[in-house]
Amino acid sequence: MQISHGLRGGRTVVSVHNGATIVTHGRGGYVQRAYVTRGGRAYYSRTFYAGGVYHVGIYRGYGWGGHMYYGFYPGVWYHPGFYGWGWHPWGAPVAWGIGAWGWGGAPWWGFYGGWWNPYPVYAAPYYWLTDYLISQQLQAAYAARADANADAMAADAAASGDSGGGGGDAAPVASGPVALTPEVKEAIAQEVKAQLAAQQTQAADQGDAQAAPAAAAAPATASNTPPPALDPSQRTFVVDTGVTVVANGQECALSSGDVITRLTDTPDADNNVNASVSATKKGDCASGQTVAVKVDDLQEMYNHFAENITNGMGELAKKQGTGGMPAAPDTGTQPGAVPPPQPDTTAAAALQQQQQQADQTESQVKQEAASPGGGTQ
């Protein structure tokens, strides 16, 4: 069992049990298991559980440089035309205000309002998706801060013998936000556009495989394909959760919604690549710093980015043709090569058990450190 704590709070616990990888963080987590193999590619199911709700995703395995990585893979694809519509401009800009987004009055919006401003109008769907993606990451950042504050209060109450019943969850406290520049937003938008163009091609391949599977070319195996996080064309990454990185030999924190630009393509001996901090919030790594970030963390940023694009396309499919947004030519869906798995309904119990084991382990370590002679040889 590996237990790590972020510089700004929050705990992540990882273990492997009976072939399943169990990851807990904050008040949720996921359980990953081997799922199916298609054309030499290994796919895995991830069952996420938080707040009493399950959702499941497909992840493709990539063996590269002696490490395994897992990349998000859509279980259902739209027809190619919808992706093409997504990365081409609309005939005229579309106004889509805060009321249309439904963000007005939301605590996270008030907290981050000075750091990020949505576009006043949208020239293309991929700009709309860019604001959707950023909003999802900032909502996650706000929730993570609230959870970390609540967990810290609970730990302090436990240490002092107080039940903590009167405190409740503490909201994050704003601390001088820094603006997300138009240049950084444009870099994110261009990554979204490139992803949609790639997905248009992939969606066409899904249809071709359905029509004539015998004619499909032999795919690359998991052991000779680098993960998407190391794709030379993929440079801009939006941080998905709290991450500890190293700048000039010193650790610093990145939080959900921060933006980094990958500078190097080849991991070092510690499985790190270099990245530049493009946009950050008060208390995180300074903007402009070069940091060493683990490829595993970079891949998870990519995964959340790709999943949010998929979710955002679902929102576009619902909203196209309404509120002044042009209608899309085709929002039909088609099955992918790998069917979506069923949720692992044992995940909640596995995550709870792991959290309890981590609590016990940390409690034991503290007791040993506090005992006479604790920590000495």
What is the predicted function of each stretch?
Residues 227-228, 248-254:
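Short, surface-exposed secondary-structure edge patches
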Residues 256-259, 274, 329:
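C-terminal assembly and membrane-engagement modules of membrane-active proteins
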Residues 2-176:
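Low-complexity segments
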